[in-house]
Curated annotation (Swiss-Prot):
Keywords from the UniProt entry: Aminoacyl-tRNA synthetase, ATP-binding, Cytoplasm, Ligase, Metal-binding, Nucleotide-binding, Protein biosynthesis, RNA-binding, tRNA-binding, Zinc
Binding site for ATP: T335
Protein name (database record): Methionine--tRNA ligase
Compartments, as annotated in UniProt: Cytoplasm
CDD domains: Anticodon_Ia_Met, MetRS_core, tRNA_bind_EcMetRS_like
Species of origin: Porphyromonas gingivalis (strain ATCC BAA-308 / W83)
Family from the record: Belongs to the class-I aminoacyl-tRNA synthetase family. MetG type 1 subfamily.
Catalytic activity: tRNA(Met) + L-methionine + ATP = L-methionyl-tRNA(Met) + AMP + diphosphate
Cofactor(s) demanded: Zn(2+)
EC number: 6.1.1.10
Length: 680
């Protein structure tokens, strides 16, 4: 950070209020944001940490429909749960509000109207699916159908969750409404678009030239989007849950949630600081920092800055230190499959151990690549680092002081070379910590803080005061004085990371007033004669039985998912026998098979069909290596019209069966038959 700012505004991605918060959210966004905010406050810097719940959009409307309640009831329930969970973990928001608040509705509406009146939107008419039975337009998640890539018949109108392909609703085969189950029809509808292409030259200069210091994963994703060329993006949609578009002729339309949600940062600041919010959002002396996950990079680095620039009076983000994803026990976290460690459950099952989770998530943070959380690693880091290094040193320093000096800080005598080296080592921690925290390297910063405890342990091991107590109490006094100064330094260094443990440590040191960051590295934090509190265990060892219970909990979830997946899908509606006879299903021999360039999921087949041969593209690359299928016989539908996939004309569909775990298995004849044989 070359430029000096007077204040820092820190925002965190708004969690979606249709479910609880899990460890992936925490590791990606909220723990690092809280560490940074606590660090700045400890340094005496003027900063705000802004948070809130994202409460509009299709998933919330769908959840309400499934539960037979209103969307407002859904968001009320989860907003309170999320807010309590954050408080329980010590996420120190200056405000945690919500996008259903009156002030947010007004702020988002005014923002839209400002851009509308300035002519910053373009109006476009497009075709969108409409449910004639329900008499409403269908947003992408209100439509399901068959994925054209992997044949999953439960793909949504925006994405197939089986193969991960992004889709448009019109890509789906046999689309149907999730509301009525009927086949929707295409109807024209008008929407407003933010012309991102208009802002592309500015964004290229601002990001690619002006922010080369951004994290490589953030900069790289932005560059990729800019290199592909930006397209206009709809800011409205046909939906009955959200903030109504505030212009005439927009009945039944609401602000798209991606446009609505980031304005929540502004409205939440207005709610907190009604008289001074503009200082935080419109002053060039304010530094704006967005903490987000990688799925929000484009919105916060390209779309939201384009919105702010179009409005004209707001500052732009100075940094967006986005993290990658955290996996769980080797598998992607999934809320729909309940494959997660939920924060509210953790707080109930591990009372008083908030800092253990904060420590593990920071030590294993997915800062530049996806990382994995395992319960065995959680246990090992607690037992081998927090207990054996940090807690062990603090306990020895305090217990020995109580034993030899009745719990009072002993005088510091003449320093030896060992003392001087130790002082020099722990004094250097401050600068190392500042460098890592200022550049958003929280994992490395935590290592530097823990290094301070390692310095203390080594010092006690080298000096062995328990042996010197028999012959040289003056030397013991100096050793324990320095050990206590290191202990007090640990309370400062760990406050951003482990606030509960730092507060407990301050209590054991009998110090009510917290030390400022500027005193980190000092050797006079605790004056001679200061009486310490009673020593307690700062951390407790986690037994195997505790961890085994958590692993079993996940195993039970996995078994439940497999059981649910094994239930056969409902039988489709009857069709006429004549319609079935129209399908020409044949057996072909695979002559060639290769991956399609720039398409992770697609394989290109050259098939001997007993005639002139044909090319078929199939979305099974994640389930087979190409060489596995060469020479094998497969079943395929031969009379589908050709369809281009990634520029390759596909002349049919290879038939596969989907297993309970989502894997695909190509259907093959039990014994070899002549190429081109029909399936009867």
């Amino acid at each position: 950070m070359d430029r000096q700012f007077k204040r820092t505004l820190i925002t965190t991605a708004l969690p979606y209020a249709n479910g609880p918060v899990h460890i992936g959210h925490l590791a990606g966004v909220y723990v690092p944001a809280d560490i940074y905010a606590r660090y700045l406050r400890l340094r005496g810097r003027d900063c705000l940490l802004i948070g809130g719940s994202d409460e509009h959009g299709v998933p919330i409307a769908l959840k309400a429909k499934a539960e037979g309640c209103t969307p407002q009831e859904v968001v009320d329930r989860y907003h309170e749960l999320i807010k309590r969970s954050f408080e329980g973990l010590g996420i120190s928001f200056d405000i945690y509000s919500r996008t259903t608040s009156d002030i947010h509705r007004r702020t988002a509406s005014e923002f839209f109207k400002t851009l509308y009146e300035k002519g910053e939107f373009v109006e476009q008419t497009s075709e969108q699916y409409y449910d004639e039975e329900a008499k409403q337009f269908l947003a992408d998640r209100y439509i399901i159908g068959t994925c054209p890539h992997c044949s999953n018949d439960r793909a949504y109108g925006d994405q197939c969750e089986a193969c991960g392909t992004s889709l448009n609703a019109t890509d789906l085969i046999d689309p149907r409404s999730t509301i009525s189950g009927s086949a929707p029809v295409l109807r024209e509808t008008k929407h407003w678009y933010l012309p991102l292409d208009k802002h592309e030259p500015f964004l290229k200069e601002w990001i690619l030239d002006g922010h080369k210091e951004w994290k490589s994963n953030v900069y790289g994703q932005c560059k990729s989007w800019l290199d592909m060329g930006l397209q206009p993006r709809a800011v409205s949609r046909d939906l009955d849950w959200g903030i109504p578009v505030p212009v005439e002729g927009a009945e039944g339309k609401v602000l798209y949630v991606w446009f609505d949600a980031p304005i929540g940062y502004i409205s939440n600041t207005k709610e907190l600081c009604p008289d001074s919010w503009e200082t935080w959002w419109k002053s060039e002396d304010t530094r704006l920092v967005h903490f987000i996950g990688k799925d929000n990079i484009v919105f916060h680095c390209i779309v939201f800055p384009a919105m702010l620039r179009a409005e004209g009076s707001f500052i732009l983000p100075d940094n967006v230190p986005a993290n990658e994803f955290l996996n769980l026990e080797g598998d992607k976290i999934s809320t729909s499959r309940n494959w997660a460690v939920w924060l509210h459950e953790y707080l109930e099952e591990f009372p008083g151990k908030q800092d253990v989770l904060r420590y593990v998530l920071t030590a294993n943070a997915p800062e530049t690549k996806d990382n994995d959380f395992t319960w065995r690693d959680f246990q090992a880091r607690n037992n081998n680092e927090l207990v054996a290094i940090f807690g062990n040193f603090v306990n020895r320093a305090l217990v020995l002081t109580h034993k030899y000096f009745d719990g009072a800080v002993p005088p510091k005598g003449e320093l030896t070379d060992c003392d001087s080296r130790t002082i020099e080592e722990f004094a250097a921690v401050k600068q190392a910590l500042e460098h890592q925290l200022d550049t958003f390297h929280f994992r490395e910063a935590l290592k530097e803080a823990m290094n301070l405890a390692r310095i203390g342990n080594k010092y006690l091991a080298d000096t062995e005061p328990w042996k010197l107590a028999k012959t040289d109490m003056n030397r013991v006094a100096t050793i324990l004085n320095l050990s206590l100064q290191i202990t007090a330094n640990l309370a400062i260094a760990f406050e951003p990371f482990l606030p509960f443990s730092s507060a407990k440590l301050m209590s054991m040191l009998s110090t009510d007033c917290p030390f400022g960051w500027d005193r980190l590295g000092s050797t006079d934090l605790l004056p001679e004669g200061h009486v310490l509190g009673n020593p307690e265990l700062l951390f407790e060892k986690l037994e195997d039985s505790v961890i085994d219970a958590q692993i079993q909990k996940l195993q039970d979830t996995k078994l439940a998912n497999e059981k649910a997946a094994h239930q056969a899908a409902p039988i489709a509606e009857d069709i006429a026998f004549e319609d079935f006879l129209k399908l020409d299903i044949r057996v072909g021999t695979v002559l060639e098979c290769e991956k399609v360039p720039k398409a992770d999921k697609l394989l290109r087949f050259r098939i001997d069909d007993g005639l002139s041969g044909r090319t078929i593209v199939s979305g099974i690359a994640k389930h087979y290596a190409p060489e596995e299928l060469v020479g094998k016989q497969v079943c395929f539908i031969a009379n589908l019209p050709p369809r281009k996939l990634k520029g390759i004309e596909s002349e049919g569909m290879i038939l596969s069966a989907e297993d309970a775990d989502g894997s695909l298995r190509v259907i093959m004849p039990a014994a070899e038959v002549a190429a081109g044989s029909q399936v009867k």
